[in-house]
Amino acid sequence: LEEAVLGKTRCDDLPGAQVPERYFTYLKTGEFALLEDVLRHNFDDIQSLAELTAVICSAYRQPELLRYEQDILSVGKTLLHGRRTQQARNCLKILGHSTLAPQAHLYLASSYKQGREWTEAAELWKTMIAKGEGGAWPYIELAKYYEHVQHDYDIALRYATSALQYLLN
């Protein structure tokens, strides 16, 4: 993780798996020199955790600066789970024209539905259908929307039928 995210490589580091053995040997022998490598290893761990925390905080403050689309999607999902809805939506919208747009649209539309922001949800479901995203899901959601929110049963039936046709093909 240190190398992949922080670009740091440890030199002459005590492997973490050896730490318990060194510590227990120290307890038996009282030889403090055995702990020097352990303490350096732990210090490096703590320093790296602080640096990783700064990287993560930066990712949440400015997700648009993240290098990988998957990281942006992950930040958006985490913000949704943390009920930071507007920040999550802004984050997911960054992915609007990316290869992860279909997944981002699923989460974004679900967020609108959960917030009872029906116009935004319905428009996004229609966009998903137009782009061939989401499988039968946007058809099903639109069928429920037209049945339960708009009370337009003819349109609801059309979307339900389209969902069924999609699933049968």
What are these regions (language model features)?
Residues L1-N169:
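DEDD superfamily 3′-5′ metal-dependent exonuclease/proofreading module
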